[in-house]
Amino acid sequence: MSDGRRTVLFPTFLSEASNQPIFADVASHGDELMTQAVPQVSCQQALAIAQQEYGLSGQMALLQGERDMNFCLTVTPDERYMLKVINAAEPADVSDFQTALLLHLAQQAPELPVPRIRPTTAGLPETCVEIDGVLLRVRLVSYLAGMPHYLASPSTALMPQLGGTLAQLDNALHGFTHPAANRSLLWDISRAEQVRPYLDFVPERQQYQHLQRTFDRYDSHVAPELTMLRRQVIHNDLNPHNVLVDGSSPTRVTGIIDFGDAVFAPLICEVATALAYQIGDGADLLEQVVPFVAAYHQHRPLTSAEIALLPDLIATRMALTLTIAQWRASRYPDNREYLLRNVPRCWHSLQRIATYSHPQFVTRLQQVCPENAR
């Protein structure tokens, strides 16, 4: 291949993946949404790829994934990897962007708990294989140990390290560039206007009206201000499924995974995305938000203009989650339960955040973000 990747052929095996269709939504560079089934690859095929391309053998297990086929390769109890077979709908430059990002982090911040690329035996960070007549790109990365954050009990004690780790990640990404970084992505808060047409797929009237107001406020109060704020490549998806914690000490972050939604966007959108999943159920809905922001600010100081937009950006991220999930569920009813798994909690959080006055919200955040740190 002209880009240096090697194409290898693998025989067809019976798929061990669920025969229930799982669909992935991928935004193209032309801002048009493409829908493509997740590639069907068996554990046998994945193991053959590992052996031929990476010279590795062991036990292969299927992992969950919305867009790609992911596998855990256990070579020894102390040596594990994640093999990712990338969705054919993902543009090659977007895949290269994610690979380049991980290589950049390995060089700039080797101490960060993020996946590390294992090159092929030919020394390539990616390879390309043909399965059932379809060319698919493949990436092998280190498998990070830890318990998914969503399985751990909510803990305010985790927030300082989580916020600090995200800030250190963003510090490492500062200055990183790639031609595909400025891609069109539905999950990019700074492009929230592209999701508004999907409001028609929200069936509940009260929720529909609330979401409409959220998008209206974004258009009038947020979008104009975002254009003046600093931008860089961000992770853009620090949800509890993409954070790993120490199972014996769930106040310690052991991994940040899944850079599939990384994008060049306003830095404050990184913080807003993470905080959209940290609205508490207790008497103080900002119980986890405040220590997270304080720790982030300590490592990556936020400006007053950025802090002032956080409440609306958090609400907008929740609006994206609710709208996109219900649109996809209407298209793929067989996968409805999985697609809607986060909707009830997200709707509850959006309603809660609406009860908190904007000035009060901003004041509490400013109190833990001293000017002299900026």
Give the residues covered by each predicted segment:
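ATP-binding pocket architecture of kinase catalytic cores
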Residues: 79-177
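A cross-family kinase active-site recognition segment
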Residues: 149-209, 229-231, 337-342
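An alpha-helical support segment within catalytic cores of ATP-dependent transferases
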Residues: 39-50, 177-178, 193-236, 246-248, ...
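A glycine-centered beta->alpha junction motif in the catalytic cores
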Residues: 123, 138-151, 197-201, 321-336
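Conserved NTP-binding catalytic cores of kinases and kinase-like/nucleotidyltransferase enzymes
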Residues: 12-122, 247-249, 368-373
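Active-site activation/catalytic loop segments of kinase-like enzymes and analogous catalytic loops
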Residues: 267-301, 315-333
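ATP/Mg2+ or Mg2+-diphosphate-binding catalytic cores
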Residues: 321-374
